[in-house]
């Protein structure tokens, strides 16, 4: 999930991960019209929801006769691969499920088709989708009715925990004796740290376990997607809400410093050794192997974890990102689906968008492993009981925040990755110094973009 303005693109790519592995999948329907050769290629990341989308797409092929082809690449290569495709005006992708932070660059560089007229013609209303997903995935400029994507995959950071460990009488008794309260999913980050410390180094079923898993990955976006969950709760702001691009005193406020210090303290006290460059997959591995009591990760992975034969079912529980001293927020994940502007199959791609937006399709999308953003699905009376993590997902989507979606967001992200990782993992400098340097980095980026950066 990275994008830099065209002038800096080659420089950024050289510093980023260059290798990628493509996975092309094809789902062909049985309708005779498919033989006419109509085909769409949809590009996304290679993960469980993408497999669900392939299954869902079979219905589109049966209905339309249009064959669906899929280009899926690992998350570590997702931005490199597809932003290169878009930047070079490649016609590989007709449809793309692009990250939320791409929306500014994609709109301003005319990579995506603007969908306002199409939505009006087909009576697709953004009022029918969760507000956070419309703002995060569809709008550019933000808070304006200019739409470049349909919300496709609602997602955010949540937590899993070993419910079976938490429920053991001997563990409950020891915890209550030590802390004077019942052992339960944490409601605040202070409680989370306390629980993590309690489990750190404990032996359970003959195996040494650790308190918590949090993101530390350096190369793409991982540590930023982790630390922001704490920073938001402690009062960090990207800029002055009343004065855009005024970052001094907001990015590096005393509250933000405390949040960054807390994330480092949690990393130092309560995580497994060696996880110095870890993101989504490493978290899944740690939880599935019985290494950790609690795990930070995206809701997208929770259906698969719940089905896991070793740690799923009655053994797993879910909770929302805990609150901090200044509020309760969660880092937004997820993506919208867009039509690539240079596609030779624009009409067919728009037909897919129309089909995908239907309530019945969205309901099935949720049932088979995707995360719908459609209110008709998520606000239905039975939704909270439709999955063990559904209530937490609903709650989380009411308090999400996101990283910059500016066209220069790639450099902004690289800057934050470096400053946070240097402090948290590499033990370079103080939290105040890290955030002060980040303000300088971001000020330089925005000034190069011609933005008026206010110092006070």
Give residue spans per PLM region.
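Short, low-complexity disordered leader/linker segments with a strong preference
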Residues: 1-41, 62, 444-456
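Extracytoplasmic "Venus flytrap"/periplasmic binding protein-like
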Residues: 38, 55-132, 136, 149, ...
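Extracytoplasmic "Venus flytrap"
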Residues: 39-55, 73-76, 155-156, 221, ...
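Extracytoplasmic/periplasmic substrate-recognition and gating elements
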Residues: 87, 141-145, 164-165, 169, ...
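Hinge/lid segment of periplasmic solute-binding proteins
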Residues: 100-158, 223-226, 315-322, 382-387, ...
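Extracytoplasmic/periplasmic solute-binding protein
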Residues: 139-153, 157, 188-248, 292
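Long, aromatic- and glycine/proline-rich binding clefts that accommodate carbohydrate-like moieties
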Residues: 141, 313-320, 367-423, 451-456
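Glycine-centered hinge/linker elements that transmit conformational signals in sensory
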Residues: 191-200, 234-277, 321, 439
């Amino acid at each position: 999930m990275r994008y830099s303005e065209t002038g800096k693109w080659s420089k950024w790519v050289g510093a980023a991960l260059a290798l990628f592995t493509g996975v092309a999948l094809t789902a062909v329907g049985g309708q005779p019209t498919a033989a006419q050769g109509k085909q769409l290629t949809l590009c996304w990341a290679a993960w469980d929801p993408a497999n669900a989308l392939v299954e869902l797409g079979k219905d589109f092929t049966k209905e339309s006769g249009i064959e669906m082809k899929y280009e899926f690449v690992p998350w570590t290569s997702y931005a490199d691969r597809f932003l290169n495709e878009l930047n070079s005006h490649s016609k590989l992708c007709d449809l793309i499920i692009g990250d939320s932070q791409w929306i500014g660059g994609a709109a301003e560089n005319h990579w995506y088709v603007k969908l306002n007229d199409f939505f009006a013609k087909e009576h697709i209303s953004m009022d029918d989708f969760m507000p956070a997903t419309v703002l995060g995935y569809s709008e550019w400029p933000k808070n304006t009715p200019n739409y470049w994507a349909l919300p496709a995959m609602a997602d955010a950071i949540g937590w899993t925990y070993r419910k079976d460990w938490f429920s053991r009488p001997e563990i409950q008794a020891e915890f209550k004796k030590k802390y004077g309260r019942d052992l339960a999913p944490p409601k605040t980050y202070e409680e989370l740290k306390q629980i993590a410390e309690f489990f750190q180094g404990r032996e359970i079923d003959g195996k040494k376990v650790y308190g918590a898993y949090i993101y530390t990955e350096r190369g793409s976006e991982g540590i930023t997607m982790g630390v922001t969950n704490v920073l938001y709760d402690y009062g960090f702001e990207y800029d002055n809400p009343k004065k855009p691009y005024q970052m001094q005193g907001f990015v590096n406020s005393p509250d933000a410093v405390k949040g960054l210090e807390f994330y480092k303290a949690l990393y130092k006290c309560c995580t497994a050794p060696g996880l110095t460059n870890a993101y989504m997959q490493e978290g899944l591995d740690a939880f599935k192997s019985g290494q950790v009591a609690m795990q930070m990760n995206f809701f997208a992975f929770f259906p698969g974890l719940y089905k896991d034969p070793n740690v799923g079912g009655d053994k797993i529980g879910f909770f929302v990102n805990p609150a901090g001293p200044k509020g309760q927020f969660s880092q937004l994940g997820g993506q919208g689906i867009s039509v690539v502007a240079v596609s030779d199959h624009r009409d067919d791609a728009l037909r897919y968008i129309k089909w995908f937006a239907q309530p019945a399709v969205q309901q099935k999308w949720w049932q088979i492993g995707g995360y719908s953003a459609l209110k008709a699905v998520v606000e239905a009376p039975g939704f909270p009981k439709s999955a063990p993590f559904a209530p937490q997902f609903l709650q989380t989507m009411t308090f999400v925040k996101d990283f910059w979606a500016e066209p220069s967001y790639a450099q902004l992200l690289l800057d934050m990755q470096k400053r946070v990782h240097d402090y948290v993992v590499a033990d370079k400098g103080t939290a105040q110094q890290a955030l002060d340097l980040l303000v300088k980095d971001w000020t330089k980026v925005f000034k190069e973009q011609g933005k008026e950066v206010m110092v006070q």
